[in-house]
């Protein structure tokens, strides 16, 4: 698979993951839905940063980590200089290594804005790549 095929695969996978996250967020919240939505966010964010990384590589930028992918995506004009992207990374790191009820509640309330920001960035990649 060449890098452009990899990008297409990641874009399709991101779309599927994002739809699953949106489904969880649309349901009435209880602790199981909240935890499911957080888990879906983690998976969606992984696909998000890997998509950023791949597109940055296509553009000639080196991006080997989530943080580097976000920073290079800003330089490439894919994302705006918005602290939400680094906040998402921090939240993903927290959720992957700790579990606290209060933290889970706080994170859950941010998921709709995180989902929207990721979708906007991916839309910019699509527009730039396919136009």
Describe the function of each predicted region.
Residues 1-131:
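Solvent-exposed interaction patches of small proteins and small membrane subunits
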């Amino acid at each position: 698979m060449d890098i452009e095929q990899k990008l297409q695969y990641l874009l399709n996978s991101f779309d599927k993951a994002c739809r699953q996250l949106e489904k969880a967020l649309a349901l009435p919240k209880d602790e199981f839905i909240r935890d499911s939505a957080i888990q879906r966010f983690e998976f969606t964010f992984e696909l998000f940063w890997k998509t950023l990384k791949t597109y940055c590589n296509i553009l000639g930028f080196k991006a080997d980590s989530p943080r580097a992918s976000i920073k290079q995506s800003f330089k490439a004009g894919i994302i705006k200089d918005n602290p939400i992207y680094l906040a998402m990374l921090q939240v993903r790191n927290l959720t992957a290594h700790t579990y606290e009820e209060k933290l889970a509640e706080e994170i859950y309330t941010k998921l709709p804005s995180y989902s929207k920001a990721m979708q906007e960035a991916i839309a910019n990649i699509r527009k730039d790549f396919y136009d």
